[in-house]
Amino acid sequence: MSQRQQRVADLIHQQLAELLKKEVRDSRLSKISLTAVSISPDLKQAKVFYSLLENQNEKEVQKALNKATGYLRHLLAQATVLRYVPKLEFVYDESIERAHRISLLIERALKKDDSDESS
């Protein structure tokens, strides 16, 4: 990713996080966290990765984000000085959930080793 792509991705990440917190009134979107933004080389498309902060229905949140995409893009255009505001695509980030599962598996394996050694 070029420096320009990174700067634009960081700007979009920061602005979208702020807009979701202050401007969007959909309760399904109040408990999400934006984890990363990846932008195409031509700066016309951005993938916005998000995770859920609480146990929520991921499909419902995705539906709400898809519905709010046009509005968020409009707000982003007003909040930034970008010549072209990229098309937004929201993608559920499973990496945090995966890391948590791996951590639990490691803990179980360590506990099993401890119980095997003490026997």
UniProtKB/Swiss-Prot annotation:
* Function recorded in the entry: One of several proteins that assist in the late maturation steps of the functional core of the 30S ribosomal subunit. Associates with free 30S ribosomal subunits (but not with 30S subunits that are part of 70S ribosomes or polysomes). Required for efficient processing of 16S rRNA. May interact with the 5'-terminal helix region of 16S rRNA.
In which family does this protein belong, per the annotation? Answer: Belongs to the RbfA family.
Q: Mind telling me which HAMAP family this protein's record contains?
A: RbfA
In terms of InterPro entries, this protein maps to:
KH_dom-like_a/b, RbfA, RbfA_dom_sf, Ribosome-bd_factorA_CS
The species this protein belongs to is Coxiella burnetii (strain RSA 493 / Nine Mile phase I)
Summary of subunit composition and partner proteins: Monomer. Binds 30S ribosomal subunits, but not 50S ribosomal subunits or 70S ribosomes.
Identify the keywords attached in UniProt to this record, alphabetized.
Cytoplasm, Ribosome biogenesis
| Protein name (Swiss-Prot/TrEMBL) | Ribosome-binding factor A
Q: Which GO terms describe its biological process?
A: maturation of SSU-rRNA; ribosome biogenesis
* Organism lineage: Bacteria, Pseudomonadati, Pseudomonadota, Gammaproteobacteria, Legionellales
The keyword NAD is assigned to this record: no
In Pfam terms, one family for this protein is: RBFA
Q: Which GO terms describe its cellular component?
A: cytosol
